[in-house]
Amino acid sequence: MGLAFKPGTDDLREAPSIDNISLLLKNGADIVAYDPVAMNNFKKKFPEGVVERGTISYTNQIEEALKDANICFIFTEWKEIKKVEPEAIKQLMRTPLVYDGRNIFDPEKMKAAGVEYYSIGR
């Protein structure tokens, strides 16, 4: 979740989402991407549909991005993502596993909710 290099912009320069999503698609991942601002720019790099060995689709709803997901990567610290309750993540995801590259959630709250949570760089 989160495609821009920082919140408040649609700028993708140096965005960690680009390399990471590219690698996931090359390895056959099916991705549902969410970003409140940068999705149109991201679609220019990764058009919706089959890409490499995987697929990518886009949604304007965080809940839809999480629904039945096996893993969630957080690349941008959007306030919309920060508002998601750990319990909702647990309920929506098939496998509640989150890699948070922006440290937006409290690890103890995620653990208490039953979410396997990895906060990168903390």
Task: Describe the role of every protein-language-model region.
Residues 1-122:
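Structural/interface elements that position substrates and couple domains in central-metabolism enzymes
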